Amino acid sequence: MKYQNIIDNMTLKEKAAFLSGKSEWQTRDFPRLDIPAIFCSDGPNGVRKQAGAGDHLGINPAVPATCFPTAAAMANSWDEELEQRVGVALGEESMEEDVNVLLGPGLNIKRNPLCGRNFEYFSEDPYLSGKMAAAFIRGVQSTGAAACAKHFAVNSQELRRMAMNAVVDERTLREIYLTGFEIAIKEGGAKTVMSSYNEVNGVYANENEHLLKDILRDEWGFEGSVITDWGASNDHSLGVKNGSTLEMPTPGLDAARELLASVESGKISEKDIDERVDELLDLVLTTTENAKHYKKVADKKALHEEHHKLARLACENSAVLLKNEDGILPVGAKVQAAVIGDFAFDPRYQGAGSSMVNSTKVDSIKDMLETSGISVTGIVRGYQRDGKEDEAMKKEAVDLARRSDVVLFFFGLNEKSETEGLDRKHLRIPQNQINLIQELAKANANMIGIISAGSVIEMPWHHHFKALLHTALMGQAGAGAVLDILSGKVNPSGKLAETYIKKYEDTPSYNYYPSQERNSEYREGIYVGYRYFDTAGVPVNYPFGYGLSYTTFEYDNLQVKPDGATFTLRNTGKYDGAEIAQLYVGLPGAKVFRPVKELKGFLKVFLKAGEEKTVTIKFDDKTFRYWNMKTNKWEVEGGVYSIMIGASCADIRLQDSLAIIGTTEVMPYYTNRVSSYVEGKIQQVGNEEYETILGHSIPDGSWSGELGMNDALCQMYYAKSGIARFICKKLGEKLKKSEAAGIPDLNTLFQYNMPFRAIAKMTGGMVSMEMVEGLLKVVNGHFSGLGKVISGFFRNQKLNKQYEKDLEEQK
């Protein structure tokens, strides 16, 4: 071990206490051993360091920081170099604020568009997610801070996220949900990984030996620290034994006592603890040493201004032009434009929850119009942000549209639509916005829509627009970038990192999401996003990888060799611009079922008008592989592969073939037993087929019997105790009230969906697991549990004081 000399000088009590947090954001320090505390902070798109009382939900204010476009937007740039620059800026702001570990990026695969936190994640594709995450991590860690890849793994719904079991087959786990993390670890060099709240195949992620030990540490060679999501620890001892390093936030010393008892009983060994202590020491001592050598800026305001410019550049490169009929964009200087939409006054530029940033400043369309070069007839809100109809506002907007040449309509999802802790109920934008679109289109045929939405929306109204610019959640400097695109100063170059479907019912996981019981069944398998839509022939509004430009690009001269594909790319239009060339690979007639094509490489290429470049996209170890569940290893199926170069997954410009020698000797499936998967008819997968790819029977996910430690508080609806049912009812009423007000109550949402054990994990040591056991007895109708709660309280206080005293005496 790297720090054996320090470990030898630590008592077992010190080592046990070291492996859980000291406070909401800090690790425990030991001055006598020169072990300082380090500070963690949320920050996938901006540093959220709370100056006062800490919370993990973004409720209390944080110090000012630059709010960059969210991961959903950055992924649309397909620009690894730009993502790395953003990572550097986030790392710099972390170091300026004495943040040692930045809790990002988020690599969750966008399995289903209803997930309330999709704005925080990159893509439906693991390869793109992994490449962008690796760039982010390299940038952050180049400054001396540590990045934290999250949430590991298979975490795709907010509903009961702490009490949900993801039932997923090994092939899908490897190919879809872990590949991005593999790239982030191997190519990005992430120093920390955050374990997710949920169970994976019946074992909580934070204590899952298969995930943490077999794959993360043994296969990928990860030597860093695994940090729990806040309150995600279930069995702290098993977590430590199986590869989890640090439990956060502070569970008090109950967690430390749990480790001591487990060593005494033989459940774990002191060696298990020493290994985790060594990992955490490396993180603590390395990042604090880096902080000593980091030279802080003399003028933080100047640094923030520099980063504001970078945030604007990031938006410029990630906005996606979905539609541009009649070349209506860019807007000419003499064209009189009506600017309509509440988002033009107050931009919707970030999501809610733990990633919410206290921005250094926020640009708005309204404030920047004067210098935009766009001639404006007027600017009005047009609709109420909370979704309420307002006829006076609508009439004002329609009148303005009628006397203008074009309409610039700013719209999309409001704040309550996208937030941590709450999944969306549908994919529609607010109805009052749809009604206004219809009225505006009657008044003016030249409609240009600017969409702010961190995740997929249905677009039954898109035919009303001649042009659509999708900005996702564009960060604090997005307004200037958008106006530069609309006026033609900037040529849009973003492409979609997720498929924009026609209707939610087309989603492959539609029948299984979100899970209303304990199990979340991933029956769709590897057919996530475009992998399904392409294979099943389901029409979509805008496909994965799609995005227009003000110029045009020509692909030619494809040459495929064993190590990659080379082709020429020419800008045939009048504007300078960037094209994102995409490499897809498929195997016609494959014996092992697979999507018709999968992304295996990409490159963003800038070309001046008329310029031509030779482009090469290399193959790598992931180009032809699949996971064989029978041999339990990566294999290659032999055959003649289609090598496709496209402007999107639906726009293949060049194609050739390449014969590959396979490694498969044992087939993973009998084709006749998985016909729905072979044909891509995922929404009709039956139990027998699902069990075939799982390799075992479907576990029982129904709720029954008395409530236990890992049942969510919302399940008190079924409790025997009338008091418990009353509390559950009140929590539900509180949520409905906040929803009606348009302001999600994140704290209540967290409580509603958290399991009983989290009461001990999230109360800073005030509540012990013994007390929760007593509380559960009460909930289950046994009022004798009240005595256990009371006696447990006093026992917990006494034991905590004694433990603190023992630690103090070591000083």
Residue ranges and their predicted role:
Residues 649, 655-726:
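Charged, amphipathic alpha-helical linkers/stalks
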Residues 739-811:
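C-terminal non-catalytic accessory extensions
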Residues 1-622, 626, 640-644, 649, ...:
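Glycoside hydrolase catalytic-domain context in secreted enzymes
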Residues 702-759:
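Long, charged, low-complexity terminal extensions
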Residues 621-668:
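Terminal connector regions
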Residues 8, 12, 24, 264, ...:
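Generic surface-pattern signal
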